[in-house]
A protein has these predicted regions:
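Short helix-initiation/N-cap motifs at beta->coil->alpha
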Residues: 63-73, 161-188
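A conserved helix-loop-strand patch within extracytoplasmic ligand-binding domains
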Residues: 105-154, 253
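Short, well-ordered beta-strand elements
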Residues: 28-40, 58-64, 131-132
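Periplasmic-binding protein-like
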Residues: 140-149, 247-267
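Ligand-binding "clamshell"
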Residues: 93-105, 120, 192, 197, ...
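A bilobed periplasmic-binding-protein/Venus flytrap-type ligand-binding module shared by bacterial periplasmic
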Residues: 112-123, 225-237
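Bacterial signal peptide processing site
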Residues: 21-23
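C-terminal motif of bacterial Sec signal peptides marking the signal peptidase cleavage site
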Residues: 15-19
Length: 268
């Protein structure tokens, strides 16, 4: 009896391993995709894409995340087929740090980062020693610092660009106190800060209209365009042509324009 139970257990474990292997390899289904997005604009846009896809026989299941780490992990591990939430500098940094085999296949929308405040209405109202929030992940933190520099709050060391950290601040005339926080949590902590740089998806999720509520915002032609990402092995799969065509359609462009009123800019 013991040998029979042991053999059965081995078969069970083997079947699990086989199932996992099947989930992370092979061509993506032409009838079903599981897509990871962050809550807010990326979720809303993908819901529109899913609506269009349904009419073409493609079912898109949307999994919503509230932070920036797990969508890439889940994709690499095979729990997702596609994700749509990040810009290329973030992807490049993230997959390099974690040795992930995932790649960009299309661009989506540009979501300008803004500076927000519940205490002041103009960036020039900042005072000596005020607290300034920014994302704690390397790429979005650098993006925020570059925005602060353009806004005239600081000067960064020459050449650091999207590798900038708070240690690269060369000049800080107001001796501002820079506080690094989880990007998704910054809107919740805005009342405790003089100002903060907030990614547009999280700003919209918390009820802000970036073009109206930010006190300073990136230029519309900033290079931080968002992208669709898949596993390297699936980058040429036929179903992705359908997904990209639907995403970059006139129907979706109109939806973005009407829904976000200039806070998001289509890349196509």
């Amino acid at each position: 009896m013991k040998k029979i139970i042991t053999f059965a257990l081995v078969l069970f474990v083997a079947s699990l391993l086989t199932a996992c292997a099947e989930n992370t390899s092979g061509e993506l289904s032409s009838e079903h995709l599981k897509v990871g997005v962050t809550a807010g604009p990326h979720e809303q846009i993908m819901e529109k894409v899913a609506e269009l896809a349904e009419a073409e026989g493609l079912t898109i299941d949307i999994e919503v995340f509230t932070e920036y780490v797990m969508p890439n992990i889940a994709l690499d591990e095979g729990d997702l087929d596609v994700n749509s939430f990040q810009h290329k500098p973030y992807l490049d940094n993230f997959k390099s740090d974690r040795n992930l085999d995932i790649v960009e296949v299309a661009t989506t929308v540009n979501a300008p980062m803004g500076i927000y405040s519940t205490q002041i209405s103009d960036i020039t109202e900042l005072e000596e020693g005020d607290s300034v929030g920014l994302p704690n992940d390397p790429i979005n933190g650098a993006r925020a610092l570059m925005l602060f520099e353009v806004a005239g709050l600081i000067t960064l060391e020459e050449g650091v660009a999207d590798q900038a950290t708070v240690l690269d601040i060369a000049d800080n005339p107001l001796n501002l106190d820079f506080i690094e926080l989880e990007a998704s949590q910054i809107p919740r902590q805005l009342d405790e800060l003089a100002v903060a740089a907030i990614n547009t998806n999280f700003a919209i999720e918390h009820g802000y209209v970036p073009t109206e509520d930010s006190i300073y915002i990136e230029a519309a032609d900033s290079p931080w365009v968002n992208i669709i990402v898949v596993r390297e092995e699936n980058k040429d799969d036929a179903v992705l042509e359908t997904l990209i065509r639907l995403y970059q359609s006139e129907e979706v462009a109109q939806f973005v324009e009407e829904t976000f009123q200039g806070s998001l800019i289509t890349s196509w």
